[in-house]
């Protein structure tokens, strides 16, 4: 078993990180469209940005006035910076980092369950990253109701992967203080339950 950061750093070196955009683009597009449809102008952070593909895509929107990516993998951030000179990237532990200015929208795809206590990260983002009236939106494929995902921790040999139910994730948002919480599944097919999306307003 290896740490999530080491595993994803190895993915950069092997080029496997590029598959993340292909595999997750539909879910991310669904989330970003929902989160930005009523915003004329917004600031954006991608929590666990990987090689920066979401930041690059969002920053191309005329409505986005600033885009920032944060990730714990130095290899991922190095690649992100090499591909994108106009956005801001930080290599740091998400639990320790705070933006200079709070933002309108924080997005995260396939990240939160790699933390020992994701509920603390959600609370940290609520307290320190998001403006009043701002939104957190997250997507995960690794959750209790998505049976095919149950073997992933063993398959990928990752030391920390926390399995929770949809109800648990909604409670994490509620306990952090978020309001108007919504959840849905995107991309359900056969025995695949789809990406679980949870979002709320501060």
Language model regions located:
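Short alpha-helix
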Residues: 161-176
């Amino acid at each position: 078993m290896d740490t999530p950061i080491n595993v994803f750093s190895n993915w950069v070196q092997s080029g496997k990180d590029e598959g993340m955009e292909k595999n997750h683009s539909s879910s991310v597009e669904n989330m970003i469209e929902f989160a930005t449809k009523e915003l004329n102008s917004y600031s954006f952070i991608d929590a666990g940005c990987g090689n920066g593909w979401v930041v690059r895509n969002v920053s191309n929107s005329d409505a986005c006035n600033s885009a920032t990516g944060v990730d714990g993998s130095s290899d991922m951030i190095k690649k992100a910076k090499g591909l994108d000179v106009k956005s801001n990237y930080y290599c740091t532990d998400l639990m320790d980092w705070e933006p200079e200015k709070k933002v309108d929208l924080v997005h995260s795809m396939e990240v939160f369950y790699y933390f020992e206590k994701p509920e603390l990260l959600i609370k940290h983002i609520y307290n320190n990253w998001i403006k009043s009236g701002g939104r957190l939106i997250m997507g995960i494929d690794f959750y209790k109701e998505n049976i095919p995902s149950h073997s992933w921790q063993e398959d990928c040999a990752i030391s920390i992967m926390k399995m929770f139910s949809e109800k648990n994730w909604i409670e994490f948002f509620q306990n952090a203080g978020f309001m108007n919480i919504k959840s849905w599944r995107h991309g359900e097919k056969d025995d695949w339950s789809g990406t679980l999306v949870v979002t709320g307003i501060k």
